[in-house]
Amino acid sequence: MGETVVHGTTVLAIKKDGKVVMAGDGQVTMGDTVVKHQAKKVRKMYHDRILTGFSGSTADAFTLFERLEGKLEQYNGNLKRAAVELAKDWRMDRALRRLEALLVAADRNDCFILSGTGDVIEPDDGLAAVGSGAPYALAAARALIRHTGMSIREIAEEAMNIAASICIYTNREFTFEEL
């Protein structure tokens, strides 16, 4: 199977006018081998008020999901505060610093990328993407949101299809979550 590095994915979040859609593909790759086609990389949390998605190591991502969920409970669903506090923990905790995952978290007000270095990045335009197909999905979503009248769900679908047509680590077994 070659190397055992778990590769790529594509997760895309679009937040506009109080609505949010998050999409993720289903492919899991180890080295040069596809080992799963229908993984669910996006989900709802905190009473179905927050959307989250991940790229990178699945086990590491679930560790971060659990930590984020705990912070959301601690801060009563305040995504911005929970994300910042998780990032602080991520930077200070030796075990967390070794985690190899990126998270996207969004609600109707905020959208963040939480990086492996403990950064919290808030995109200027409400669009966020992580994973190997992220540049393609993000570029497509930006173009479509600026130059069409499509809904954000339609934009997410088309952007993910474009990413899947370019990125070999992204398939068309998409999962969508919406708020």
From Swiss-Prot:
CDD domains: protease_HslV. Keywords: Allosteric enzyme, Cytoplasm, Hydrolase, Metal-binding, Protease, Sodium, Threonine protease. GO terms for cellular component: HslUV protease complex; proteasome core complex. It catalyses: ATP-dependent cleavage of peptide bonds with broad specificity. Its EC number is 3.4.25.2. It holds the Pfam family Proteasome. GO terms for molecular function: metal ion binding; threonine-type endopeptidase activity. It is found in: Cytoplasm. Na(+) binds at A164, C167, T170. The keyword 4Fe-4S does not apply. Allosterically activated by HslU binding. GO terms for biological process: proteolysis involved in protein catabolic process. PROSITE patterns: PROTEASOME_BETA_2. NCBIfam families: ATP_dep_HslV, PRK05456.1. A double ring-shaped homohexamer of HslV is capped on each side by a ring-shaped HslU homohexamer. The assembly of the HslU/HslV complex is dependent on binding of ATP. Belongs to the peptidase T1B family. HslV subfamily. PANTHER family: ATP-DEPENDENT PROTEASE SUBUNIT HSLV (PTHR32194:SF0), METALLOPROTEASE TLDD (PTHR32194). This is ATP-dependent protease subunit HslV. The gene is hslV.
